[in-house]
Amino acid sequence: MRISRLLIRVLLGFVILFITYILFPSIPKALVNTLNVYKLEERLNYYNDRLLDGNLKSKELENATFVTLARNADLYDLIETINIYENRFNSKHNYPWVFLNDEPFTRTFEVVMSRLTSGPTYFGVVNSSEWDIPKWIDMDIAHSNWNRLSREGVLYGGMKSYRQMCRYFSGFFWRHPLLDPYKYYWRVEPSTKLLCEVNKDPFRQLRLLNKTYGFVITLFEIGQTVPSLWNSTLEFIEKYPETLAKNNLWEWISDDNGKKFSHCHFWSNFEIADLDFFRSDSYRKYFDFLDKKGGFFYERWGDAPVHSIALSLFLDRNKLHYFDEIGYSHAPLLHCPRKGRCFCKPEEIDLSSNSSCIARFINLTNEDYDEL
């Protein structure tokens, strides 16, 4: 048995060397070295064990995909992230991965990402009309506001590309043709990490639990970035009252009966959700209404508060799910569960206090969470 295992490893090693140095000699040597550092032995062991166990039959998958919006310069940060997601979850399932960029990906980026992922990979370019600043924005006013926010020390306060990204994730990512075939998506950003082994399929959990949207981290939005977002939302509700769900989560996003925004939101750099919510008539109307207000560029409206307000108003509160068992990190924040094979220090949540957004969410939804 040991001889068979050794032989398989040697053969796989030669295959990897052939692919790297013969088929793709243009990949920088430093990049090849970086790839070799990331658990080559672990990957060989994984595929070796599957071969020996005869366990190569594909498992039934949900109609789902990973989604990453990235630039070519994010390649090295993504190498670590993709390896972690593959080793701690996707190598057991082989879900596809959709990569989007506002410009064409390089051949090196596509080759490396395709080698790292266990499922199919697809690479797309964002439609320029959905990425560029719309014509109704007064750029003199916008630049003046950007400079002010930058002077005030607001994170990304003066950054144009950040605003473009927030607007794209608020109203357009789900319209990309590469996402048309799918029902569920899992958003992954460069430099993020899974801190635990993910033993349950989150896509399947959403379907079986009849949930629409899943998250791991909640926090308060920076008030300076969304001064008019709530009033714009109230205008929308007055115009389209039929969009409100009966058992919505109004109290989570406003603790004074709608006078002010609580600033609580789901941190959207990690979200696992049903794309049909964003495809819905209610959400489309809401985004189009906000887009005409110009707050993505005159202020710094993020996709996180936009998603969160829409989810809290247009969905039954029982459609929202806290993936408390999934450990996740996006510096400087992380979520570390109490249970599971994790590589972090577990956190405590005081459910007796409404000072945190997650405590308020749990108290309002009355769900039982094993980790708490």
Swiss-Prot record:
Gene3D superfamilies in UniProt: Spore Coat Polysaccharide Biosynthesis Protein SpsA, Chain A
Family annotation (Pfam families): Glyco_transf_15 (PF01793)
GO molecular function: alpha-1,2-mannosyltransferase activity
Keywords, sorted A to Z: Endoplasmic reticulum, Glycosyltransferase, Membrane, Signal-anchor, Transferase, Transmembrane, Transmembrane helix
Active site: E271 (nucleophile)
Keyword set includes Transcription regulation: no
Domain of life: Eukaryota
Topology class, membrane: Single-pass type II membrane protein
GO aspect biological process, one term: protein N-linked glycosylation
Keyword hit for Transmembrane: yes
InterPro entries: Glyco_trans_15 (IPR002685), Nucleotide-diphossugar_trans (IPR029044)
Family note: Belongs to the glycosyltransferase 15 family.
Role summary: Probable mannosyltransferase involved in O-glycosylation of cell wall and secreted proteins.
Name this protein carries in UniProt: O-glycoside alpha-1,2-mannosyltransferase homolog 2
Organism the protein comes from: Schizosaccharomyces pombe (strain 972 / ATCC 24843) (Fission yeast)
Gene field: omh2
